[in-house]
Amino acid sequence: MNFDFVYKICTKSEWNGAKENKIFKGTPLDLNDGFIHFSDINQVKQTLNKFYLNQPNLVLLKVDALKLQKLVWEQSSSGDMFPHLYSDFDIDCVVKEYSLDLKEDGNHKI
């Protein structure tokens, strides 16, 4: 696991709303689950394929994990460890954003 950065997948509109408010509060799934779902760099493709297949207008946010005080790594139902954040985060924690273009087969170009 790389503890320096975690990655958040969200829609462009969710990210634009966060930039307007200077804070990211989470996606509808995050809000329902009570924490913000992240992936490490090796989990991004798996997360995209499992939850975002055929979904256009997505962005991938590279987030400085060292700035996230309430970040914990928890075991998922698959047995893998995933980073979860039990708070909002300031958009200044995002060090890079990537547009995730949708390919014809429904997967995303990273």
Task: Report each predicted region and the residues it spans.
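Conserved, structured core segments of small domains
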Residues: N2-I110
